[in-house]
Each structure stands twice: as structure tokens, then as C-alpha cells.
Regions:
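Substrate-binding/active-site clefts of carbohydrate-active enzymes
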Residues: 2-7, 12-62, 69-190, 212-218, ...
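Carbohydrate-interacting/catalytic domains
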Residues: 1-65, 71, 96, 101, ...
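Active-site beta-loop-alpha junctions enriched in small/polar residues
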Residues: 14, 69, 114-116, 201-203, ...
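Hydrophobic faces of well-ordered beta-strands that scaffold small-molecule active sites
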Residues: 7-10, 64-66, 109-111, 196, ...
Length: 458
């Protein structure tokens, strides 16, 4: 699967493109369809993503994960239409042009798909509001006419986790499933998307995910499905019948927390529990989506108590098993915290142009290591995980496949450190050093403050 050898880059388009936070009043589907037939507009806000294509290609990005760009009430997850691009961003032709530009740069497109719920402005829900019992769409939702909603609709309905601006879809209704699958087909044929990120996949009907898996594989044999999951056993949905990957929130927490508490035992425990060589390790052979921040959680530059740990944190991210995903702007360390008057929008700012710095150059180096067609990339993308030396302030682990072994050494503090281990004997290619020289080690390895080293056994 191509995704297992790729660095992802996440863009939240409504924020990134500076769109208004609230949409205009809902319009009929046919009116959206008419606007969709217009020619591409080079000044459409969504075209900003295409303008970053050269930068993303140079950075080593192989896929862009685009959070919901479809017509919605406000933040994208309160969908009005699953068939057309949000008017605040542009039109369907504009998004098709964005996808074409990304593909021309060798970058695949994964769309954030919201199948668990829709917004109150969703066309079928508005029909129920108007026609009540007589609406042919009343069974598309979990509705009772024996009660009332907090909005006074004249009926009760189930919202997502108590958020009644998000109306839960009935995924056991064949008509709903057919509508969703037809929407996916249109995205694949009209935009050429290469995969989906499934919002709140942990809540989706399992039979629906099985059918989606079969349907998308028929569209494109290498179509990737990545689910949003928080806790629990990821094997329940990441398997041969459902999803290819899911978000690794366990290791997300372990990454920043290990640096903040100066306790590398935490992330080492999580990584071994998930990917280690013991029979009880639970995700061996799986490729989970790894990240240090995203559109729902504080930026790494804000959550780290020691900002000098940005570099070793990204070194850990790219060295551990999984699919690394960078959230736009974090590659040069922009801050962002939840709460305050802007709420989650503070995590989703408009950015005019890239502002690369030394951190960006380091992440670029890491991304290109992962995407290379060589032994080191195979070890980093597919190699087994093994802890070698664990200290509170330092961690040395191994990624090994049939033809390559890479040692990843991380120093989480502002003082030098010398590792000692039998695995540090022999010749190694110092992958992150200038010109990647071969070094001879005799059981010890020196690390500068906050340094990360990747050593390929020669």
C-alpha cells in the first residue's frame, strides 16, 4: 500500500484558506449543482492549496489529507451537501483543479469524509423539518415524533455525542448507504481522490465500513481508508475487511507527554506494546497514522514545555512505526491552543505562504528518508520495533527488516549524552549527518543536546 511509504500533510481548508466561519443560508442542491458547472476560478480560496504544491513536493510530502471541503453550515463537519464543494472555498471545478495540480506534483489526495452525521442544513434533514411524517427522508435519521428537539423542530432526533447541531445518520438504512457510496464514487471520478479519512470511525456501523472497503477497492485497487479513532482496540476496525489504518492517539499522547515529563519510558512502553516483537504486542504489521498535532488538539509548539524538544519530537515521529502526518504550519513551529474566544479556530489559522526554517529543513530531511527507494526507507517504513536503551531523558530503539537495520537515538534534554550498548558496535551510515558519512562505533554513541541520530547498519 502506497500510504505506508508516504508522509502525509494535513490541511484544514476552511481555516487555511481564510473562509468565513459561518456559511450563508442553505440553498437547494440544484442551485449548488449549477454553480458546480462553472469553469475553474484561479482566485477561488481553495486554489491556495494548489499554490503550495511546489513547496509540498520539495518538503517530501506524498499525500495531502484535506479536512472536509464540502458545503456545510460552519466548520465542515456539519455537512449540507456531500456532492459539492463549499461555496466559501470555491466550486467543484476549482477543487478538481487543485487535485489535478497536486497529482501533477506526485502528491495524492485523501479526503476527510463525514459519514456519521450531517449538519442541520443538510438537504434531506431540511426536508424532514418541512414535511415531518410525510418526508421520504425521515428514516435517514434516528427520529422520534413523540418528542421535540432543543431547536423546537416538532420531533426528537439523535445528535452526535449530544451535539444536536450534528444530526446522526442512519447507516443501517440502505438508501443512506447508497447515497454515501454514490458520493464517494463522484469524488473519485470527479476529483480523482486517492483515499478517505473517516471522521469518528469508531462510531461508524461495521457493516457499512465493510461495504465501503469493497466499494472503494472496486473503484481503485489502492484506494486507502484511514479511520479516526481515539481509544480501544484499533484491530476492531483496522483489518482486511475494513480500514487500512487509523489515527494513533495512544502514541500521540505518549510523544508530547514523554518530553514534557522527561520520561521516555512512557513512549517506549506504548511503542513496544503496539509494535514490539513479543507475541502479546497488539499492532505488529499495522501502519497507524502518527502525528504530533492536528486540527483538534493543541499545536506541538504550544503543548511542549521545552520548545527545544520540537526537533527530537519530530525525529521520534519519523523514526517510530506508522505513517507520519504533518499538520500545516507546524513544520516551522507555529503555536496554537484550544479555547478562548476563537475556540478550535485558533488551531486552524489562515496562512498566506510557507515560512520554512531550520525545523522545516529537518522535517524535509526526515520525509525524504522515508520516501527513498532504499534499504533505510524499508527499515523505517516496514521494520520491526525494538527498544534498545531506555532512560528518562534518552531513548535508543531499533527498526529492522530483512535487509536493513536503523537505530534511532533521541536525546530529550539540553545536555550531551553517551549511549552505551552492544548494538552500537560496527559500521553505520549516519543518515542525518551532512553527506551521510559512514562511522565506526565501538559500543558507544555521543549525542549533543536535543539531538536525534538515525544510524543505518552498514
Amino acid at each position: 500500500m502506497w500510504a505506508y511509504e508516504t508522509t502525509f500533510y494535513q490541511i484544514y481548508p476552511l481555516g487555511f484558506c481564510g473562509a468565513p466561519r459561518e456559511n450563508a443560508a442553505p440553498v437547494a442542491e440544484d442551485e449548488l449543482a449549477q454553480a458546480a458547472n462553472a469553469a475553474p476560478n484561479p482566485d477561488a480560496p481553495i486554489m491556495k492549496i494548489a499554490q503550495w504544491a511546489d513547496y509540498l513536493q520539495e518538503l517530501g510530502i506524498g499525500a495531502v489529507l484535506i479536512n472536509p471541503p464540502l458545503e456545510s453550515d460552519s466548520h465542515g463537519y456539519d455537512t449540507r451537501s456531500l456532492r459539492h464543494i463549499d461555496r466559501r472555498l470555491g466550486g467543484d471545478a476549482d477543487f478538481a483543479a487543485v487535485c489535478e495540480t497536486l497529482h501533477a506534483h506526485g502528491i495524492r489526495v485523501v479526503l476527510d469524509a463525514v459519514f456519521n452525521h450531517v449538519g442541520r442544513g443538510f438537504w434531506a434533514f431540511r426536508d424532514v423539518q418541512e414535511r415531518k411524517w410525510d418526508s421520504p427522508y425521515k428514516d435517514w435519521f434516528h427520529i422520534s415524533f413523540d418528542g421535540d428537539s432543543c431547536y423546537g423542530d416538532g420531533f426528537w432526533y439523535e445528535g452526535w455525542e449530544g451535539h444536536f447541531e450534528l444530526v446522526k445518520l442512519n447507516l443501517q438504512n440502505p438508501a443512506v448507504v447508497d447515497y454515501l457510496l454514490e458520493s464517494v464514487r463522484r469524488w473519485a471520478e470527479g476529483f480523482g481522490i486517492d483515499g478517505l479519512r473517516l471522521d469518528v470511525a469508531y462510531m461508524l456501523d461495521r457493516d457499512f465500513m465493510r461495504r465501503l472497503h469493497t466499494f472503494t477497492r472496486e473503484l481503485k485497487p489502492d484506494f486507502v481508508l484511514i479511520g479516526e479513532t481515539l481509544h480501544g482496540d484499533y484491530n476492531q476496525i483496522v483489518n482486511d475487511e475494513m480500514l487500512d489504518s487509523c489515527t494513533n492517539y495512544e502514541c500521540y499522547k505518549g510523544l508530547y507527554s514523554s518530553f514534557n515529563s522527561v520520561n521516555m519510558f512512557e513512549i517506549a512502553h506504548s511503542l513496544h506494546r503496539q509494535f514490539g516483537g513479543d507475541p502479546w504486542c497488539i499492532y505488529r504489521g499495522k501502519h497507524l497514522l502518527s502525528f504530533v498535532d492536528n486540527h483538534d488538539v493543541p499545536r506541538l509548539a504550544s503543548i511542549l514545555t521545552d520548545k527545544s524538544c520540537l526537533r527530537p519530537a519530530y525525529g521520534m515521529l519519523f523514526g517510530m512505526p506508522g505513517i507520519p502526518c504533518i499538520y500545516y504550519g507546524s513544520e516551522w513551529g507555529i503555536p496554537g491552543e484550544k479555547g478562548g474566544p476563537d475556540g478550535d479556530w485558533a488551531l486552524r489559522p489562515a496562512l498566506d505562504e510557507p515560512a520554512p526554517n531550520e525545523l522545516t529543513a529537518f522535517i524535509k530531511q526526515l520525509a525524504h528518508l522515508r520516501s527513498a527507494d532504499d534499504a533505510a526507507a524499508r527499515a523505517l517504513n516496514y521494520g520491526a520495533y525494538r527498544n534498545v536503551v531506555i532512560q528518562n531523558k534518552q531513548l535508543l530503539f531499533e527498526r529492522a527488516c530483512d535487509d536493513a537495520t536503523v537505530l534511532v537515538a533521541v536525546n530529550a534534554v539540553g545536555e550531551p549524552y553517551a549511549f552505551g550498548a552492544g548494538e552500537l558496535n560496527g559500521s553505520f551510515v549516519d543518515l542525518l549527518a551532512d553527506d551521510a558519512p559512514t562511522v565506526e562505533l565501538t559500543g558507544a554513541l555521543e549525542l549533543a543536546p536535543y539531538e536525534v541520530r538515525y544510524l543505518l547498519r552498514a
